[in-house]
Swiss-Prot record:
Subcellular localization(s) per the UniProt record: Cytoplasm
Similarity comment: Belongs to the ZC3H15/TMA46 family.
Organism: Saccharomyces cerevisiae (strain ATCC 204508 / S288c)
Composition skew (Basic and acidic residues), residue ranges: 46-70, 316-327
Cellular-component GO terms for this entry: cytoplasm; cytosol
KW Repeat (keyword) present: yes
Main location: cytoplasm
Keywords assigned by UniProt, alphabetized: Cytoplasm, Metal-binding, Phosphoprotein, Repeat, Zinc, Zinc-finger
Coiled-coil regions listed in the entry: none
Lineage: Eukaryota, Fungi, Dikarya, Ascomycota, Saccharomycotina
Sites of Phosphoserine modification: S301
Protein name (record): Translation machinery-associated protein 46
Location of the region described as Disordered in the Swiss-Prot/TrEMBL record: 1-70, 316-345
Length: 345
């Protein structure tokens, strides 16, 4: 059906009104602000058009929400894991592929679908180990060092906050590299192989300046250091050392040592060896009776241990702990009282 005349007249009037409002404006086709104003005027003059646009926008959002809900229900995604030594940004987010990731820039995985295609392919015709051997730590900066550490050791596997001392020593001494192995068990080391927070890698120039500053510092010998420390002492409270007082101190020291040994020997129980030696010293016939004894102890007559047994019984009746050793002292200690009580029981 042809449009009614009333509607045609109304549309023509609106069009004329729009032309009148924008008449005389400069730079209609150049200025973005003017174009924006013209669109605003046109939308105000035709409210149904703006209403249709908003309705389509709401319909589009509703369809997107339904599609996201359908994917979440029928296409579940398992937790995406990262292997040790792999940068998460080199992997495309699995939820982003399905359109369900709502983390945006905070997601640790990449939202670029071309990230996997841009990865450099490994050249099978070249051996890269020689390049790594020449790529020593002397040419690295702090950023390169952290990347190599992450590539070699991967994500930390331990819960301790302590950093491996061998790792720090290797980094500070410039011995760390691609082929460095931790002496504390290699990859099974229980401590962290990562730089502590606030660590700053010193450059070769800084190390050279430190060495020069150490070389410029005054050096003294051990004798000079001792004399310097002696000069700091308060001489009014000390006695100067002379030959006479040193000899007297040595004599007193020897006497005190002898008295301490006598006091200790009077308290402790004599060993079997000491009893034998004492008996041989007191009884001269003990040596003469055994002078004809053959060298081979497996051949010969039995010993008369009567005196030794009496000495043991005499020692057993004393108040202290009993004999603590036997023979030459190499045997384990034992308690005669405990042994006698065990035999009686």
């Amino acid at each position: 059906m042809p449009p009614k005349k009333g509607k045609q007249a109304q549309a023509a009037g609106k069009k004329k009104d729009n032309v009148d409002k924008t008449f005389g404006m400069k730079n209609k086709n150049r200025s973005t602000k003017v174009q924006k104003y013209i669109k605003q005027v046109q939308s105000q003059s035709d409210p149904k058009k703006e209403e249709m646009r908003l309705k389509k926008l709401e319909e589009k959002k509703r369809r997107e929400a339904e599609e996201a809900e359908r994917r979440a229900l029928f296409n579940p995604v398992a937790d995406q894991r990262v292997r040790a030594g792999v940068d998460p940004k080199s992997m495309v987010c699995a939820l982003f592929k399905l359109g369900n990731c709502n983390k945006g820039a905070k997601c640790k995985f990449s939202h670029d679908l071309n990230v996997g295609r841009r990865m450099e392919k490994k050249d099978l015709y070249q051996d890269t180990r020689s390049e790594k051997e020449n790529d020593t730590m002397d040419n690295w900066d702090e950023e390169k060092l952290r990347k190599v550490i992450l590539s070699k050791h991967g994500n930390p596997k331990t819960t301790t906050d302590k950093v491996c001392k061998y790792f720090i020593e290797a980094v500070e001494n410039g011995k760390y590299g691609w082929f460095w192995i931790c002496p504390n068990g290699g990859d099974k080391c229980m401590y962290r192989h990562s730089l502590p927070e606030g660590f700053v890698l010193k450059t070769n120039e800084q190390k050279r300046l430190e060495r020069e500053s150490l070389e410029k510092q005054p050096k003294i010998t051990l004798e000079e250091f001792i004399e310097t420390e002696r000069g700091k002492l308060d001489k009014s409270k000390l006695t100067p050392i002379t030959i006479a007082n040193f000899a007297q101190w040595k004599k007193d020291h020897v006497i005190a040592k002898i008295n301490a040994e006598k006091k200790l020997s009077s308290k402790r129980k004599p060993t079997g060896r000491e009893i034998i030696l004492k008996m041989s010293a007191e009884n001269k016939s003990f040596e003469t009776d055994n002078a004809d004894m053959p060298d081979d102890v497996t051949q010969g007559s039995a010993w008369d241990l009567t005196e030794f047994t009496d000495a043991l019984k005499k020692a057993d009746h004393q108040d202290d702990g009993g004999i603590k050793d036997y023979g030459d002292g190499s045997n384990p200690t034992f308690d005669i009282k405990k042994a006698n009580s065990a035999t009686l029981a």
